[in-house]
């Protein structure tokens, strides 16, 4: 089993990785938008109707749902993190995009189409990385505001189940107020699944969702996922082998298998890219739906760039 992992890691190094952003070669925002829209149309299939909208009652918008999704991905792909800056640049393409909606409408519809955006992302993942046997799991803190301002934060006031919380980040040795992003990726660096929880939720609780979505595979994590009871439960219920490094003072200590340590760097590299290129730690959202839509848009933009 470990021999197969070593071979996969060797092939992943030999493979030439494409540039994950085209803004250095393609400065035209409309050209990027048109290219991503064409890909979304090919992948969406039965998710939308002929006009590119999710079937629903009421007025049929001229600027389709697929165009909203593609515009969201295009803006994130070129590093435009502000809606104000995005619509300032879109004024140059009024002729190419005659049915362009207003900024307020775009903000509302981006939240509505976030589920469509995630469904398209999942289809791209299945086409790129559908037969993986090894996965990496990790979490990333998403800070909403400073702890001193947490009582004045209006995010999640209407629904406490979606409200942020106070958590501790061991890698940065700090407490923060916000959420925790849990993600599972393959050896090729494609994020298969992710979720947002309160910052106070322990990493090991996300394995309950992993047990439902995955089976007959190996999941590689860090020391935050150490639990003999959880390891046994995953193996007995879904035949998932959870591999985590031992603590230095742990009984029956064993050295970490080098291939597991190298494989775990995949998801750490992804989190670094999401922070630097896609600026995932920035927060302009005023409510939880807006924040969740931003996270989905950034991860979907990363996935479609990998797909290209």
What are these regions (language model features)?
Residues 1-308:
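Short alpha-helical elements
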């Amino acid at each position: 089993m470990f021999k197969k992992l070593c071979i996969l890691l060797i092939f992943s190094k030999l493979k030439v990785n494409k540039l994950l952003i085209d803004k250095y070669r393609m400065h035209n925002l409309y050209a990027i938008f048109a290219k991503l829209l064409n890909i979304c149309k090919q992948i969406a299939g039965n998710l939308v109707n002929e006009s590119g909208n999710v079937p629903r009652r009421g007025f049929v918008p001229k600027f389709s749902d697929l165009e909203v999704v593609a515009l969201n991905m295009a803006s994130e792909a070129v590093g435009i993190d502000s809606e104000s800056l995005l619509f300032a640049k879109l004024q140059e393409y009024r002729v190419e995009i005659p049915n362009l909606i207003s900024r307020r409408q775009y903000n509302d519809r981006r939240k509505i189409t976030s589920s469509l955006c995630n469904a398209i992302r999942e289809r791209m993942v299945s086409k790129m990385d559908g037969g993986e046997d090894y996965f990496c799991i990790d979490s990333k803190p998403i800070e909403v505001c400073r702890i001193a301002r947490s009582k004045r934060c209006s995010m999640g006031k209407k629904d406490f189940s979606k409200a942020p919380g106070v958590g501790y980040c061991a890698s940065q040795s700090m407490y923060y107020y916000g959420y925790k992003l849990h993600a599972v990726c393959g050896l090729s660096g494609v994020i298969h699944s992710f979720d947002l929880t309160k910052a106070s939720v322990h990493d090991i609780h996300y394995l309950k969702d992993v047990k439902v979505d995955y089976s007959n595979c190996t999941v590689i994590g860090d020391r935050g996922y150490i639990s003999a009871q959880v390891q046994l439960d995953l193996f007995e219920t879904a035949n998932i082998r959870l591999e985590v490094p031992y603590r230095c003072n742990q009984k029956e200590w064993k050295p970490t298998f080098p291939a597991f340590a190298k494989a775990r760097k995949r998801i750490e590299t992804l989190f670094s890219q999401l922070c630097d290129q896609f600026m995932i730690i920035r927060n302009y959202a005023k409510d939880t739906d807006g924040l969740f839509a931003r996270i989905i848009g950034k991860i979907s933009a990363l996935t479609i760039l990998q797909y290209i």
